[in-house]
Amino acid sequence: MMRRQWGLWLNLALSLWLLTGCQQPAGQDTSARVELGPRPAYLVAQLPEGELKQQLQQCQGPLQPHDFSIGHRGAPLMFPEHTEASYRAAAQMGAGILECDVTFTRDRQLVCRHAQCDLHQTTDILLRPELAGRCSQPFQPADAASGRPASARCCTSDIDLDEYLSLCGKMDGVNPAATSVQQYVQGTPDWRTDLYAGSCPAVLSHQQSIALFQQLGRKMTPELKTAEVSMPFQGRFSQQQYAQQLVDEYKAAGVPPEQVFLQSFDWQDILYWLQAEPDYAKQAVWLDGRYEDPAFDPMQPGSWSPSMDELKAAGLNIIAPPLWVLVTSEEGAIRPSAYAKAAQQAGLNIISWTLERSGRLDDGGGWYYQSITDLTTDDSVALQLLHVLAQEVGVMGVFSDWPATTTLYANCMLP
């Protein structure tokens, strides 16, 4: 039986590869070529027998890039996040939209990094003595006697743009038990890989990301990251200037508003864009962080404020909560939450995050699956959840750390 299942999986993987990798006419723009690799077929093979599995197995190519499939920081399941290699991998897997999380350097230049102060865990800055000495908090080794973990804090605002661009990206992670810098930077989770982290993956400025995404023919979704330094920075760079500079760089590159999905967790940023940049703000995405409130309950509308109707009336068109907020476990099945239904009824479009960020799912799935832990027993739940989000919640897109999965679903199951 195991040999038969392996054979079926191998046949499906080969079929998907043939559909996606071998049907490009000579001379065709490679930015439109989609190559999924074996992971989507592996997930399909894990699905229980039924209509979803059958439809995905019978799906015919060629597959195309799709806006439903959003590359979360590129393709960081296997490539260092926010690097050129990661973005190119996401585009190759058919992500129609690519994300640059935006923060700023000491000379107030915008760069792609998930957090202003994560350089110690996503780049090789600590291995560069000339730059490591500029970190806000130098490396401190673990102390087993006191139980103190190893730590460091290196921020984009500690260095200038040219220094930032000299860094190499690495897989996100640190080793809290480290007693040396060399040990500390080796913290990649075992369900990811360092296989594609060699040869100094290039980090990018925001402007460079725009040029790359234009070259790849993809739409763009920058997230204005919350500053981890006091604003106004250096006494003269305000939050509104920061938000405006982000939009100005798209204007300068000639990127039309319909190609850009601005994002922020800060509602004040959304309001600023609605007033100052109404054309770009039509597709602004409010990343809903209200789940951090202990009283928040996606099944209880009274636990969140403003209401969905109030958000829509303020001019918001797209709301983006994490995966678990949009679903609930009901009679052994994944179903839309009250939050999802309220957003639908208010006329809000929905984007969600982040698929393929939880490692293996046979242990309940962790944070992103917390509302359906009892149903999360194997890796195929990623596709089952995606199916409910697309067909019952009606999301317009899903961020993924491995966009091949969302690309396959979008091509095979969406109009």
Model-derived regions, located:
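Phosphate-group recognition and catalysis centered on beta-loop-alpha active-site segments
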Residues: C22-P415
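Bacterial N-terminal signal peptides that target proteins for export
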Residues: M2-L10
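Bacterial N-terminal signal peptides
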Residues: W9-T20
